[in-house]
């Protein structure tokens, strides 16, 4: 799919032009409703940027906006004409790409950690999760939320695949919501992982119905959790993003992000160890491990048809300020990935 453009990447993946000045905190491709591929990235430098991705792998910077604080999440409107941007300034802004205008559409009492578009047959809204311990649902034409749900703790991660939403909170809380008619709590449980979770992603079954989620923790481990497991053994955890050090001890790194392939249903994890790995959860096997980057991988995502995998390389502060090297700049890479993520054939 991609032609030969220059790259400094050891795997010859394609480097995105004009990346942010600080680590990437959010990375989302445009939805399938848009003919071309656009990529949006939010960063700790308080910017959100948009690129057009061409067929040969080249990226064309289209626009950039600066928010009132570090960006923690982004999501696209269902028609691909707008981008919602959640920030540490306690607001969510709507960025209209055609007019290049920005307006506030949501607010919390603390930094907004997650934003997701909910598109059901009877309503469309924006779901926002915050460190103020609330989950809010917004009709973006109105200044007040349609609904506010109090969470037991701060929202750390979330995902939406209609009619399901899932929220991971501080203190290892996991809450599943049904979005049919209106958002209602369906199930609440403690995380199967012993350590703080950082990433969550919903997966679908063969009928394309959302049936569970993958949850990643700072302890190099992922849990595959079905909402209603046919067999308790369907739920399992696996180790990842670990290396055996010279002394024989294991170095354990955080799972920073998880994404499911939109066609194959296989998944990718990215970590503080500077690698990504492709997995087949049904065969319970690893499909591929990447080379190790010289910094952590902070975020990742697939484009709508599953041809392109994007991942962001940058420091995630997992080793504290003494390991921060200002000479190492953030980078975003694109990889042609469709065949590599095909499920294992038994």
Swiss-Prot record:
WD repeat extents: 17-61, 64-105, 126-148, 255-289
Domain of life: Eukaryota
GO BP annotations, alphabetical order: cell differentiation; cell division; hippo signaling; male meiosis I; mitotic cell cycle; negative regulation of synaptic assembly at neuromuscular junction; positive regulation of G1/S transition of mitotic cell cycle; positive regulation of gene expression
Effect of residue 129 to D: Male sterility. Spermatocytes display various defects during early meiotic stages, post-meiotic stages and late spermatogenesis
Keyword Endoplasmic reticulum part of the UniProt annotation: no
GO cellular component: cell periphery; chromosome; cytoplasm; Nebenkern; nuclear envelope; nuclear pore; nucleus; perinuclear region of cytoplasm
UniProt-annotated location(s): Cytoplasm, Perinuclear region; Nucleus; Nucleus envelope; Chromosome
InterPro entries: G-protein_beta_WD-40_rep, WD40/YVTN_repeat-like_dom_sf, WD40_repeat_CS, WD40_repeat_dom_sf, WD40_rpt
Tissues/organs with expression: Head (at protein level).
One Pfam family here: WD40
Protein name: Protein Rae1
Effect of inactivating the gene: Larval lethal. Larvae die at the third-instar stage. RNAi-mediated knockdown in the testes results in male sterility likely due to defects in primary spermatocyte nuclear integrity, meiotic chromosome condensation, segregation, and spindle morphology. These defects lead to a failure to complete meiosis but several aspects of spermatid differentiation can still proceed, including axoneme formation and elongation. RNAi-mediated knockdown in the developing wing or in the proliferating cells of the developing eye, reduces their organ size.
Function, as annotated: Probable component of the nuclear pore complex (NPC) which regulates the nuclear export of specific mRNAs and promotes cell cycle progression during mitosis and male meiosis. Acts with Nup98-96 to promote the nuclear export of specific mRNAs such as Moe, however it does not appear to be required for general nuclear mRNA transport. Essential mitotic and male meiotic cell cycle regulator with roles in many aspects of the cell cycle including chromatin organization and condensation, spindle assembly, chromosome segregation, and maintaining nuclear structure.
Keyword terms of this UniProt record: Cell cycle, Cell division, Chromosome, Cytoplasm, Differentiation, Meiosis, Mitosis, Nucleus, Repeat, Spermatogenesis, Transport, WD repeat
Subunit structure: Interacts with hiw; the interaction with Rae1 may protect hiw from autophagy-mediated degradation. Interacts with Nup98-96.
Provenance organism: Drosophila melanogaster (Fruit fly)
GO molecular function terms noted in the UniProt entry: RNA binding; ubiquitin binding
UniProt similarity note: Belongs to the WD repeat rae1 family.
């Amino acid at each position: 799919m991609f032609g030969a453009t220059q790259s400094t990447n050891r795997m010859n993946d394609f480097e995105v032009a004009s990346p942010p000045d600080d680590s990437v905190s959010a990375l989302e491709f445009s939805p399938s409703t848009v003919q071309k591929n656009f990529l949006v990235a939010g960063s700790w430098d308080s910017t959100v940027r948009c690129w057009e991705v061409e067929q040969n792998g080249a990226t064309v910077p289209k626009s950039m906006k600066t928010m009132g604080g570090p960006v923690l999440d982004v999501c696209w409107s269902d028609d691909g004409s707008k981008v919602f941007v959640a920030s540490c300034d306690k607001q969510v802004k709507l960025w209209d790409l055609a007019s290049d205008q920005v307006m506030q559409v949501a607010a919390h009492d603390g930094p907004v950690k997650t934003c997701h578009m909910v598109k059901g047959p009877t309503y469309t809204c924006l779901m926002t999760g915050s460190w103020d311990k609330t989950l809010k649902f917004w009709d973006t034409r109105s200044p007040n939320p349609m609904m506010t749900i109090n969470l037991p703790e701060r929202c750390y991660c979330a995902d939406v695949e209609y009619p399901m939403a899932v929220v991971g909170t501080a203190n290892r809380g996991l809450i599943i919501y049904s979005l049919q008619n209106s958002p209602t709590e369906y199930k609440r449980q403690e995380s199967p992982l012993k350590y703080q979770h950082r990433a969550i992603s919903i997966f679908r079954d063969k009928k394309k119905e959302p049936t569970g989620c993958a949850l990643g923790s700072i302890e190099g481990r992922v849990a595959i959790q079905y909402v209603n497991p046919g067999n308790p053994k369907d739920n399992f955890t696996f180790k990842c993003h670990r290396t055996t050090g010279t002394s024989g001890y294991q170095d354990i790194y955080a799972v920073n992000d998880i994404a499911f392939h939109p066609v194959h249903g296989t998944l990718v994890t990215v970590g503080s160890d500077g690698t990504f790995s492709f997995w087949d959860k049904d065969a319970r096997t690893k499909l591929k491990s990447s080379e190790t980057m010289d910094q952590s991988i902070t975020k990742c995502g697939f484009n709508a048809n599953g041809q392109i995998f994007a991942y962001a390389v940058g420091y995630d502060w997992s080793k504290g300020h003494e390991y921060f090297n200002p000479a190492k700049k953030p980078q975003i890479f694109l990889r042609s990935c469709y065949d590599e993520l095909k499920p294992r054939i038994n």
